[in-house]
A protein has these predicted regions:
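Membrane-interfacial helix-loop segments of redox and metal-homeostasis proteins
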Residues: 2-160
Length: 160
């Protein structure tokens, strides 16, 4: 840590811990949201591979997870989008747990969360304007990644 000079003394000293912003509460919330994102994405992944339709989140024609999860847009280069979600949230969870060990974590967390948000916004556009139906699980995942992106921005601004 850089040395600081106090106004009443010309002696250099280590900065006290209160001058360093603690982002731990933000990373804890990010970790909890990432676990929630893993759960939502895992349920969506299960629905992607399920043989039968369920009424789990098929509440109306306009809200039908099975239509979204079985559409041509439910895979990206042959990988289920929900599987990408599970992997992405797992990476975010890992970053949220190692944040004190690596100084680059806030930047990578923000970049990853923003990439996930852009992808989720694209998929939400497809739901609403191409498929003309909404997936409640997908909208939940969008809310989670938007929250993580916001927190990533807060964390990043506090570490500068």
């Amino acid at each position: 840590m850089p040395l600081a000079v106090t106004p009443d003394s010309k002696e250099p000293r280590q900065p006290d811990s209160t001058s360093v912003k603690d982002n731990r509460p933000f990373f804890v919330v990010v970790a909890v949201l990432a676990v929630l994102g893993i759960a939502v994405s895992a349920v969506s992944l299960q629905r992607h591979y399920a043989k039968s339709q369920t009424k789990f989140c098929d509440v109306a024609v306009q809200f039908n997870c099975d239509i979204v999860n079985r559409s041509e847009f439910s895979s990206f280069f042959g990988i289920p989008v929900a599987g990408i979600g599970v992997a992405g949230y797992a990476i975010i969870l890992a970053l949220a747990t190692i944040y004190r060990l690596r100084p680059w974590v806030p930047n990578v967390l923000l970049a990853g969360a923003l990439a996930g948000l852009v992808f989720a916004l694209y998929l939400t556009y497809v739901e609403g304007f191409v498929l003309d139906t909404w997936c409640i699980l997908c909208l939940g995942s969008l809310a989670i990644i938007a929250s993580i992106s916001t927190l990533g921005g807060v964390i990043n601004s506090r570490t500068r």
